[in-house]
Design a protein with these regions (language model features):
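Metallocofactor- and cofactor-centric catalytic cores in central/energy metabolism, strongly enriched
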Residues: 1-209, 216-290
Length: 290
């Protein structure tokens, strides 16, 4: 399998993809010894890489929420939707996912899409309905115990908040899980509702940053890319400020969604320019990525 992967046309420079086999090298210690010079060579190559300025159109943002509460759909999620629109306006890409968590609110997406794209989204929803039914479940059972303790009681409430992350830009494409994103704009990638699995697909599709809203206090990170955390309420911000990047609870105190969305967009640019996120500073992200 590894030789096939090394020969994949998607690899810009196959020479940077190296692998050693314990069986072929003659044991564990021999493999470690053989790996040392290879790692030195790769480190020298990596050290020659320099950051260069690129336009905001290069941004590919995975939109995520986890540990949502009753305020997520009022504060953090719609504010992220404003930021999503700003990214798209600059020629960038934002990816909404978690198909089981838009259930009941899909009309808010299909109404912003061409008939062809709308049908692609509905086909994915029908697949998930069938999948749940085959295993004796139903799509209405999605809200977790934590969601319910936070004030979300039905999938419809949760879905309305989840869709708000997508702002108001037209839905330009629907992708299968982990398929490469081929065009900019606001797009949807089919995925389960489980955050690590969904983020894995988004990163495989081309996301270079995750922006993640939470009301209950998720501290997950996703090591291949930075993860910017948005708190939905002031209480979470006051208790877990060391893990949250932006407080969206002040929207309830009068800060407008437009101003908060602009703040999130500026933070996205800062992180893309090298500023570490809180989850990176805390060392999260080694195990959350599938």
């Amino acid at each position: 399998q590894l030789p096939v992967l090394q020969a994949a046309p998607q690899l810009k420079d196959p020479a940077h993809f190296r692998f050693l086999s314990i069986q072929n090298q003659g044991g564990t210690r021999a493999t470690i010894d053989a790996a040392r010079p290879v790692l030195r060579e790769l480190a020298e190559t990596a050290n020659r890489v320099r950051r260069v300025a690129v336009p905001a159109s290069k941004l590919v943002i995975g939109l995520q929420c986890g540990g949502s509460d009753g305020l997520s759909g009022i504060t953090a999620n719609p504010a992220l939707g404003v930021a999503s629109d700003l990214v798209v306006a600059q020629g960038g890409t934002t990816i909404l996912s978690e198909t089981s968590e838009i259930y009941g609110a899909e009309h808010l997406l299909t109404g912003r899409a061409t008939p062809e794209v709308a049908e692609q989204l509905m086909e994915r929803i029908r697949w998930w309905e069938d999948y749940a039914a085959r295993f004796g479940g139903n799509m209405d059972n999605n809200p977790s115990p934590g969601n319910k303790r936070g004030g979300l009681t039905t999938i419809l409430e949760k879905s309305l908040g989840a869709v708000a992350k997508g702002g108001s830009a037209p839905l330009t494409a629907v992708y299968r899980y982990a398929d490469p994103i081929r065009q900019p704009g606001f797009v949807f990638m089919d995925s389960p509702g489980y955050d690590p699995c969904s983020v894995t697909g988004q990163v495989a599709s081309g996301a270079n940053m995750i922006v993640f809203t939470t009301g209950r206090g998720s501290v997950s990170g996703y090591r291949p890319v930075p993860c910017l955390k948005l708190a939905s309420n002031n209480d979470l911000w006051s208790r877990m400020g060391e893990d949250m990047d932006i407080n969206c609870g002040d929207i309830l105190d009068g800060v407008s969604l437009q101003d908060k969305g602009a703040e999130i967009y500026r933070a996205i640019l800062d992180v893309a320019s090298g500023q570490p996120t809180k989850s990176e500073a805390q060392g999260f992200g080694r195990v959350e990525f599938v």
